[in-house]
From Swiss-Prot:
<keyword id="KW-1017">Isopeptide bond</keyword>
<dbReference type="GO" id="GO:0031386">
    <property type="term" value="F:protein tag activity"/>
</dbReference>
<comment type="subunit">
    <text>Strongly interacts with the proteasome-associated ATPase ARC through a hydrophobic interface; the interacting region of Pup lies in its C-terminal half. There is one Pup binding site per ARC hexamer ring. Interacts with the Pup--protein ligase PafA and with the depupylase Dop via its C-terminal half.</text>
</comment>
<comment type="pathway">
    <text>Protein degradation; proteasomal Pup-dependent pathway.</text>
</comment>
<feature type="cross-link" description="Isoglutamyl lysine isopeptide (Glu-Lys) (interchain with K-? in acceptor proteins)">
    <location>
        <position position="64"/>
    </location>
</feature>
<feature type="region of interest" description="ARC ATPase binding">
    <location>
        <begin position="20"/>
        <end position="58"/>
    </location>
</feature>
<dbReference type="GO" id="GO:0070628">
    <property type="term" value="F:proteasome binding"/>
</dbReference>
<keyword id="KW-0833">Ubl conjugation pathway</keyword>
<feature type="compositionally biased region" description="Polar residues">
    <location>
        <begin position="21"/>
        <end position="32"/>
    </location>
</feature>
<comment type="similarity">
    <text>Belongs to the prokaryotic ubiquitin-like protein family.</text>
</comment>
<dbReference type="Pfam" id="PF05639">
    <property type="entry name" value="Pup"/>
</dbReference>
<protein>
    <recommendedName>
        <fullName>Prokaryotic ubiquitin-like protein Pup</fullName>
    </recommendedName>
</protein>
<comment type="function">
    <text>Protein modifier that is covalently attached to lysine residues of substrate proteins, thereby targeting them for proteasomal degradation. The tagging system is termed pupylation.</text>
</comment>
<dbReference type="GO" id="GO:0070490">
    <property type="term" value="P:protein pupylation"/>
</dbReference>
<feature type="region of interest" description="Disordered">
    <location>
        <begin position="1"/>
        <end position="32"/>
    </location>
</feature>
<dbReference type="GO" id="GO:0010498">
    <property type="term" value="P:proteasomal protein catabolic process"/>
</dbReference>
<dbReference type="GO" id="GO:0019941">
    <property type="term" value="P:modification-dependent protein catabolic process"/>
</dbReference>
Amino acid sequence: MNAKQTQIMGGGGRDEDNAEDSAQASGQVQINTEGVDSLLDEIDGLLENNAEEFVRSYVQKGGE
């Protein structure tokens, strides 16, 4: 999967304060997106190797 970047724009207030807040928020979103992409890649790899065992490990007995 490709890493995606998300840009967050703030509204209202002084431009100087918003520019700093937007830069911090944007960086945090990028870090979280990369972590999610990494996790999804790991899950895809497990499913390719043995999907049935992967599903069994998360399904409770009795259909609960």
